[in-house]
């Protein structure tokens, strides 16, 4: 009901696709009718930075910093050529990976193999990106170098209620 009324967007993690078609159809209808978050007051984007999780310098943080980006469109988006950067000018060029509608990609500051992790989460490793633990801004640009979205955080880690990466959130 929330998706239908434009109060939420479709969001999927993992392989279970039981309700994907229904939720994407309801989202498309809400977008078409310009209700809720899809209204004229909002700036509709296909890709949105939803979470920033900088490392915590006061703890032995076993998980690397990351930024989560959601596909709010109703189509698969190829991320090849997109760039995620920060205020310090560090950049991460996305490889040739695709993100299905309603899914997210984790841009992790750790190292590893890019692709879908065991629990169905798409992960891209950007070891050249270091996020300032106190304040920073994430910038996402498309292959044409147009700004797609920004996400500024200040203070402690910024995350939504379901923004967890590898294990328990602190």
Please report, for each region that a protein language model flagged, where it lies by residue.
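Small beta-barrel nucleic-acid-binding modules, primarily SNase/OB-fold domains
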Residues: 1-170
């Amino acid at each position: 009901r929330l998706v239908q009324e434009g109060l939420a967007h479709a969001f999927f993690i993992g392989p279970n696709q039981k309700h994907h078609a229904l939720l994407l159809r309801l989202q498309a209808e809400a977008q078409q009718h310009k209700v809720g978050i899809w209204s004229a007051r909002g700036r509709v984007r296909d890709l949105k930075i939803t979470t920033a999780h900088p490392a915590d310098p006061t703890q032995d943080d076993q998980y690397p910093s990351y930024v989560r980006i959601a596909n709010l469109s109703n189509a698969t988006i190829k991320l090849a050529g997109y760039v995620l950067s920060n205020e310090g000018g560090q950049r991460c060029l996305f490889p040739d990976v695709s993100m299905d509608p309603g899914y997210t990609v984790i841009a992790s500051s750790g190292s590893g193999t890019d692709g879908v992790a065991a629990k169905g989460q798409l992960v891209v490793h950007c070891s050249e990106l270091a996020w300032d633990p106190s304040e920073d801004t994430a910038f996402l640009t498309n292959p044409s170098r147009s700004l797609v979205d920004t996400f500024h955080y200040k203070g402690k880690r910024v995350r939504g209620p379901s923004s967890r990466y590898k294990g328990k959130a602190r």
